[in-house]
Amino acid sequence: TELVAQAAASGDLSQAQAVFERGRLIAVHCTSQRAEGVGGSQSARLSVDHPAVREHLATLGRALDWHGALVLDYLYDRAEAQPYYIEANPRLVEPMNAVLSGVNLADILAQLSLGRSFAAEPLRVGRFGVRSHSLAATLLGQADGGASRRDLLRLIGQAATRRGVFADSAEDLTPARLDPPSL
């Protein structure tokens, strides 16, 4: 059995979602975690600008001649402007923050799959500073972490009054005002 040891890394849990066309990066969106869901996932996100990550993605996609979606999870050290990569996956993950930021990654991926070429178009990057959340994922994360019923009710109250992590933030998985049955 072989073991791999590495130094601990610190930083903001972040994620980059990208779409490539035959090795060329055509759309990218980065977020950092504002609240934790089950298993440490991002249940609330803030769109961020991580130029080094965009550059690394472009290099990786070109080297692999990647075609389709790719997601990188990483820790981002703000002081050093340095990402520390955790994993990569060939899919999109909860892309609503990207949509709210002006880049519909799922639509771009669908159009690419149907044969549309984006070769003549500039790289699409979402606006920075857009906040989104999933109340359900946040509640599940808090419950999994041992939060009491009172704590969970307090969190629901914050969501209803748009305070705390829910202030200036859009619901991305169950938007009750737009889709009441989603609750």
Protein language model features and the residues they cover:
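Phosphate-binding site of ATP-dependent enzymes
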Residues: T1-G39, R45-H56, L75-Y76, Q82-Y85
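Peripheral (often C-terminal) accessory segments that flank ATP-dependent C-N-forming ligase machineries
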Residues: Q111-L183
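Hydrophobic alpha-helical segments and helix-packing faces
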Residues: H50-V53, H67, G102
